Every structure is written in structure tokens, then in C-alpha cells.
């Protein structure tokens, strides 16, 4: 069978459900990143706090506290990335052996669904989880870039490059957080 023949096995409701998932995912992400002015999202509020953090960072001595916060952020991204990887593995294992799904299907409906339909539906879940994994890995990497830039901030607050570099570190930190939240 060709791929189009396999796709023909999906019902119109399957296509509507897949479309609704993808459209909802896109709209929700857009609403989080572009909130209404009266009700800013946590992402917008935290972006300002991250900028404030880097302004204070320039004058803080010692900077161990800041390195611990950044290490904690990186550990969070690494945890979620590894969790996504485990979930992708679980979904792919389930796609390889759909018997557990057939058992649930037998209890819920009188219909029998071809194995390929289960695999196609699980494929969408695997793609979404893979996207999440890549976003978490990228966020972890950008937090690493932020750490390098923070290390490049001079210890002397009077240095003319101190605050501009801290501002750059803040923007990298914000970018990493945005990727983490996507």
C-alpha cells in the first residue's frame, strides 16, 4: 500500500481531531507569547524579571547565587528533554506493538481498527513529543550560551561593557525561556 492508501483509512473525524490539535497548539502558543495588554502572561512578566536579574547580577559579589540559578534552569531543561525522549520511546514501542491498544478498543467499542491507524495516530503524538524534545534541548543550549555571556561580564560594575553584556545575557536567558515554554 502506498502512503495515500494508508491515509484513506483515516475518517474525517480523525482529520478534524488532528487539525484541532495542531491549530489549538499554535493558537495557545501565540496567545502565551502575545498576551492582551491588560493580562500579561507569565512569560512576559518573567522576561522583565530576567532583565532585572541581570542588572543586579552586575553588582552582586560573589556571583555564586546567579550561577546556581542558571544551573537549576539548565537542569530543568535537561530533565524535561530526557522525559520527552522516554515518552517518544514509549510511543514508538506502543506503535510497534498495538495489542494493548486493541484490548482497550475491544472494551470500549465494537469496532476493530487496523493496526496502521493506531500507528498513524501514535505518529502524531511522537512528532509532537519529538518537537518538545528538540525545544528543550535548544533551550538548554541557549541557557549554556547565557552562562558563557554571564561569565564574560566584568567584575567591575564601572566597566563600560558590564551592563551591555549583562543585557545581552538577559536577552539570551529570555530566548531560552521562550524556547522552553514552546
Question: What are these regions, as identified by a protein language model?
Answer:
Residues 14-42, 80-89, 122-144:
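Hydrophobic alpha-helical membrane-embedded segments
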Residues 35-36, 40, 94, 98-99, ...:
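Membrane-interfacial segments
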Residues 32-70:
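Membrane-interface amphipathic/juxtamembrane segments adjacent to transmembrane helices
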Residues 114-117, 123-167:
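Cytosol-/stroma-facing membrane-proximal "stalk/adaptor" domains immediately downstream
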Residues 1-5, 85-111:
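Juxtamembrane "helix exit" motif at the C-terminal ends of alpha-helical transmembrane segments
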Residues 66-93, 118, 122-126, 135, ...:
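Transmembrane alpha-helical segments and their cytosolic interface motifs
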Residues 53-67, 148-178:
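Solvent-exposed, non-transmembrane helices and loops of integral membrane proteins
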Residues 8-19, 109-125:
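Hydrophobic alpha-helical transmembrane segments
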